[in-house]
Regions:
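Acidic, glycine- and Ser/Thr-rich low-complexity intrinsically disordered tracts
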Residues: 70-73, 315, 349-355, 369-512
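Secretory targeting signatures
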Residues: 1-5, 10-51, 163, 275, ...
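Right-handed parallel beta-helix/beta-solenoid
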Residues: 43-65, 76, 406
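Extracellular beta-strand/beta-solenoid scaffold signature
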Residues: 100-108, 129-155, 170-177, 191-200, ...
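Residues at the loop-to-beta-strand transition
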Residues: 57, 78, 88, 94-96, ...
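Parallel beta-helix/beta-solenoid
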Residues: 67, 85-86, 93, 102, ...
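Extracellular beta-strand-rich solenoid/capping regions of secreted or surface-exposed proteins
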Residues: 60, 64, 68, 78-91, ...
Length: 512
């Protein structure tokens, strides 16, 4: 039998003539050919063979000669800065060290789809004088460049970058990225940097299983970015903020340890985020939600021993909502051993605090200068002051109220609800819990979901506005104003605002 594909013209099944004969391929033969193509196609279309770099060899030369998709193995040793300008994977064997220099990141990523795994990366700390001197001596290096970019260990200018099982030490910025999407940092250490990671204008950041420790400013500084996930990380001893989300939305912050910071986690004008099951301890502010941060769910976090003495003896707040942050759900959190366990302050409205346990704090919950927040189903036990309201008017019950360990009323009909209201203490307080619980709201009760809570807020938080007292005197555009009606809404951004001496400590900027 003559093989029918003896020429290109005859490589057609069933109907073509080959040497004057009609050829036919049986279905079984055709199936065998297709299976063979499937089995051997990886060999026919395999990527370029991986380059292997041993200690002392030139990584940059290997990168420059590699093809897209190559895997470059880097042996143990110490190497200078590299630039990756094509989609490659660099795999460290024996923990090779990449060293940054002044204004020269250890790694500059200029391509999408780069993976860096198994490296120790040593950065350069902030040194303004040396940076100025560098650019004065290297004028061409400064041409067309932003001179305010920090000394970064890893500079990311592409998307879909993966940093795996690596360590970054003592950089002004451990990882620095502008407008990058799809960055993943996993099972890595960012230690002793000014800022562990800075991301501006990005999307899809995923940080998991990492230790971000001993940073002098921020552990993670994420601004104007969305769809971020920070999970199963240790954020410890970062001097200013452990995690800052500013002007962004869509973040999931789950199952982290956040400890030893001034602000553990801060949401600053950041909305539609989920903060769940984190342990937050030994900070000044455990979780701070401020500056118009709205529609966030703060759920099932452990807020303990946020009470320190370096600035103000014993001060510390487990969870604080401030500065017009509204429509947030604070649910199922445990606050213990703080100065204020829970706090809602300054212009916040339509928040729900539900099914929380605040015990053994100076104040269980403190409400300051706000109204129309719904507080119910919580347990305020053995605090110096269980609940406190200052210049506020809030709603403290639905069909159930809260449990207070100092409640003295009676339950005459045995329904678990006290017959006498619990008056909320505080200057000029008019609020009361009309359905105080005789036992803590516990795990036996089925917890209400987010949609149900939002519906209750709309139904119960309907107290009318009241004219609030104006401070006796204030400085306004250089003129001392003795008295005038107070505007109902503060301006969001003010260029010439008087100093607000009543604001909470440690807030760097005052916009109101």
């Amino acid at each position: 039998m003559i093989w029918p594909w003896s020429s290109q013209a005859c490589a057609i099944s069933d109907t073509e003539l080959c040497n004057g004969h009609r050829a036919r391929i049986s279905p079984l033969a055709l199936l065998s050919i297709l299976l063979a193509l499937l089995l051997f196609s990886p060999l026919l279309f395999s990527p370029a063979s991986a380059s292997h770099i041993n200690s002392g060899q030139d990584i940059q030369a290997a990168i420059d000669s590699a093809q897209a998709g190559d895997i470059i193995s880097v042996g143990a040793g110490s190497y200078s800065s590299i630039i990756i300008d094509r989609p490659l994977s660099l795999i460290g064997e024996g923990r090779p060290v990449l060293n940054a220099a002044l204004q020269k990141p250890a790694v500059t990523v200029k391509s999408n789809g780069v993976t860096l795994e198994g490296f120790e990366i040593r950065g350069v700390e902030k040194d303004t004088a040396s940076k100025f001197e560098y650019y004065m001596k290297n004028r061409e290096a400064a041409r067309g460049q932003r001179l305010d970019v920090p000394n970064a260990a890893v500079l990311v200018e592409g998307s879909d970058f993966l940093l795996l099982n690596s360590s970054i030490y003592r950089a002004q910025a451990g990882v620095y990225a502008l407008g990058a999407e799809g960055i993943t940092i996993k099972d890595s250490i960012l230690n002793g940097c000014d800022t562990g990671l800075f991301l501006h204008g990005g999307r899809g950041l995923n940080v998991s299983g990492c230790s971000i420790i001993n940073c002098r400013k921020f552990g993670l500084d994420i601004e104007w970015s969305g769809d971020t996930a920070v999970k199963n990380c240790s954020i410890i001893n970062n001097s200013n903020v452990g995690i800052l989300f500013r002007e962004g939305e869509g973040a999931d912050v789950d199952d982290n340890l956040i400890s030893g910071c001034t602000f553990g986690l801060s949401l600053w004008n950041a909305s539609h985020n989920q903060v769940r099951r984190n342990r937050v301890d030994h900070n000044y502010y455990g979780i701070l939600v401020t500056n118009w941060s709205c529609y966030n769910n703060i759920t099932d976090n452990l807020l303990i021993d946020n009470s320190r003495g370096e600035i103000t003896a014993g001060f510390g707040i487990g969870l604080s909502l401030q500065e017009n942050s509204s429509h947030n759900l604070v649910v199922g959190n445990v606050a213990r051993g703080n100065y204020n366990g829970l706090e809602i302050s300054k212009g916040c409205q339509y928040n729900a605090a539900y099914a929380n346990n605040a015990s053994g704090n100076k104040h269980g919950i403190r409400m300051n200068e706000n109204r129309n927040n719904l507080i119910f189903g919580n347990s305020f036990l053995n605090n110096n002051i269980n609940a406190y309201e200052n210049l506020s008017r809030n709603v403290w019950n639905t069909t159930i109220g809260n449990c207070y360990s100092d409640y003295q009323g009676e339950d005459e009909n045995g329904d678990g609800i006290g017959e006498q209201p619990y008056s909320i203490p505080g200057p000029q307080s008019k609020s009361a819990d009309h359905m105080p619980l005789l036992r803590p709201f516990g795990k036996d009760e089925e917890r209400m979901g987010a949609a149900g809570l939002q519906e209750l807020v709309r139904g119960y938080a309907t107290l009318p506005d009241e004219e609030e007292a104006e401070p006796a005197a204030r400085l306004e555009k250089g003129i001392m104003v003795i008295s005038s009606p107070r505007p109902r809404l503060s301006p969001r951004w003010g260029d010439f605002e008087p100093l607000d001496v009543s604001r909470s400590p440690f807030q760097e900027e005052n916009y109101f």
